[in-house]
Swiss-Prot record:
The lineage of its organism: Bacteria, Pseudomonadati, Pseudomonadota, Gammaproteobacteria, Pasteurellales. It comes from the Bacteria. This is Uncharacterized protein HI_0907.
Amino acid sequence: MENKAERYQKAVNITDVLEQSPFAKIIKKGLAINEINQKFNRIFPQEFHGKFRIGNMTDNSIFIETANAIVRQGILFRQTELLKLIQEEFPQVTGFEITINPGF
């Protein structure tokens, strides 16, 4: 019973606890991906807007989900041009992977 009483007497900063939690890390990653999506909507040509989204970003690769194969092919057709535009904002990115998500 003594251990329980000691545990509750420790001063704990709730902010520190929340910042270190797995949930906080998920939220931070989600916010970062949302910010990247907004930047990409400014970078990518108008014809692609609303037809793709960034699913994830690693050190040197971006994972893009598209609505259909036509959008995927359009992005692949302009891959070199788009990669140069991406590298202006994210120089570490060396390529991207595109997947089709029919539910998108």
